[in-house]
Design a protein with these regions (language model features):
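Structural signature of hydrophobic alpha-helical transmembrane segments
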Residues: 57-58, 111-118, 169-180, 235-239, ...
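Helix-loop-helix hairpins in multi-pass membrane proteins, especially solute transporters
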Residues: 67-204
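Intrinsic disorder in cytosolic terminal tails and internal cytosolic loops
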Residues: 1-12, 441, 445-450, 478-505
């Protein structure tokens, strides 16, 4: 390994990969599996609206808030140590979720799980980047994408089966067991850290976590309190100010939690944008469509989970295929742009959604979204990490995962709030809109409410499709190789200059 790293022991790289991949199997499963349990959780704990949505949003909020911090701490104090600490928090939060007596306790437990997930993801990504190089690194990150795809794919189906037969608490208990297995495995993983003294950028940590948390909290209150309410504008404004302060602090810090030179690299920024496009184009459908299918079409949790396999199954196989294509010479920028275009097309196509829609009608759009997600999932991390020197891989992995997790949190907060707001504009009742958005369409006006919910979905899908289309073009442009200077002879240069001046005159 390069001299920038100090190692305390050298267990096999295979064990490192296996333990990290177990983490990247469990965390996506926790995200996608929880989606099908939301209607049942709402019924059992008598919850609707923002409190119920927080079961999902709170997880992503803390995961994204702590991701960047976890990556930098991993570089300073040890990547394995942060990975293991994340596993402890994740398991504790999952156990708390399984035993929660009310929605408030469940929300708190889910936010704790999110903080743990940040340590597992940022520490795990940094461990892979520090352990593997070159084509082996590409294969390792492709395997990571494949495992994430497996978690996404089996999460709704497994959770749907357990929710229907055993209850949603068993789902969280399973996640707690997985967290403990990750913790045990971490003791067999090599430790690595950057060769510099541990110094924590406390102002940077505080301003980043506080800013992102306040911003997300304000957005989640939009539908219930009104977008012009002080309950929304206050936290959003305070969060934005703290994030501006974070940038100012990082510019002056000798040991920043985020070295801003990372995002000055146009190609690294391009891969971060590609990472953001994935949750924008897929997370809203993955999280909220099962609620629509259960509430409007009357599907069981198990059947809704099986339907989502049409989206999640491609993510099982395509990350590894994407990595192989890049290793065989296919330009990564073309693959990334194609993937984001597929996300755009899939969301536009999904406007075929209507009450009584058949699974066959959903096959095309869900496959398009799944293929777009899978193609790019296996190449983003490896391509981005290849642009970063070894001493900053933890910070870079943390930032990249912050973009992914923050994108997920923002997408869920915005789509959840916008769906509820659009339904409320049609029903005139915030309470009724919250119940409809949570999948509760019981009552004599069920058909009318289903139509209103569907109209709201269509507006959201068209908006997401437009964002992804713009994102695809931007990603392709940012990832373009730098133009090579053309050597021109002195005589030809003088001739060209003369022609240019003549043309201007």
């Amino acid at each position: 390994m390069p001299s920038e790293f100090s190692r305390t022991r050298r267990p096999g790289t295979v064990m490192t990969a296996l333990v990290v991949l177990l983490g990247f199997l469990t965390l996506p499963m926790s995200m996608s599996g929880t989606t099908v349990a939301i209607p049942r959780i709402g019924e059992d704990l008598h919850a609707t609206g923002a409190a119920l949505q927080w079961v999902l949003t709170g997880y992503f909020l803390t995961a994204s808030s702590f991701m960047l911090v976890s990556g930098s701490l991993a570089d300073l104090f040890g990547r394995r140590r942060i990975f293991a600490a994340g596993a402890v928090l994740y398991a504790a939060g999952a156990l708390g979720s399984a035993t929660a007596a009310n929605i408030a306790m469940l929300d708190v437990a889910r936010t704790l799980s999110g903080a743990g997930a940040a340590g597992v993801m940022a520490g795990g990504g940094a461990l892979l980047a520090a352990t593997f190089q070159g084509a082996a690194r590409t294969r390792a990150f492709a395997a990571m994408g494949t495992m994430s795809g497996i978690g996404l794919a089996i999460g709704p189906t497994l959770s749907g089966w357990m929710v229907g037969g055993l209850g949603w608490r068993v789902t969280f208990a399973l996640f707690a067991v997985s967290g403990l297995l990750i913790l045990v495995g971490s003791f067999f993983v090599a430790e690595s850290r950057a060769d510099r003294g541990p110094k924590v950028d406390r102002p940077g940590v505080a301003s980043f976590i506080g800013g992102l948390a306040l911003l997300m909290f304000g957005i989640t209150q939009g539908a219930q309190a009104g977008w012009g309410s002080p309950r929304v504008l206050g936290p959003v404004a305070a969060g934005a100010l703290l994030l501006v302060a974070f940038v100012a602090v990082e510019r002056r810090s000798d040991h920043p939690v985020l070295d801003l030179t990372l995002i000055r690299d146009r190609r690294f920024l391009g891969w971060c944008l590609a990472a953001l496009a994935v949750p924008v184009g897929s997370s809203g459908v993955l999280v909220f469509l099962p609620t629509y299918l259960q509430g409007v079409n009357g599907l069981s949790a198990r059947d809704a989970g099986l339907t989502m396999l049409m989206l999640t199954a491609p993510v099982l196989f395509l990350p590894a295929a994407g990595g192989r294509l890049v290793n065989r010479g296919v330009p990564a920028r073309h693959l990334a742009a194609l993937a984001v275009l597929l996300l755009a097309g899939g969301n536009a196509w999904l406007t075929v959604l209507h009450p009584g829609v058949t699974p066959l009608a959903l096959l095309g759009p869900l496959l398009a979204i799944g293929v777009g997600n899978g193609l790019v999932a296996g190449i983003i991390d490896a391509q981005a990490m290849s642009l970063v020197e070894p001493a900053r891989v933890g910070m870079a992995a943390g930032f990249l995962n912050t973009v992914k997790g923050g994108g997920n949190a923002l997408v869920l907060a915005v789509i959840g709030a916008v769906l509820t707001s659009l339904v409320q504009a049609r029903t005139g009742s915030a309470e009724l809109a919250g119940r409809i958005a949570a999948g509760d369409l019981s009552g004599p006006e069920r058909a009318l409410h289903a139509a209103q919910f569907t109209d709201a979905w269509h507006l959201v899908l068209w908006s997401v499709a437009a964002l992804c289309a713009v994102g695809a073009l931007t990603v392709h442009r940012l990832l373009a190789p730098a133009a090579r200077p053309v050597k021109v002879s002195g005589e030809e240069s003088r001739s060209r200059t003369g022609r240019t001046l003549s043309a201007k005159i």
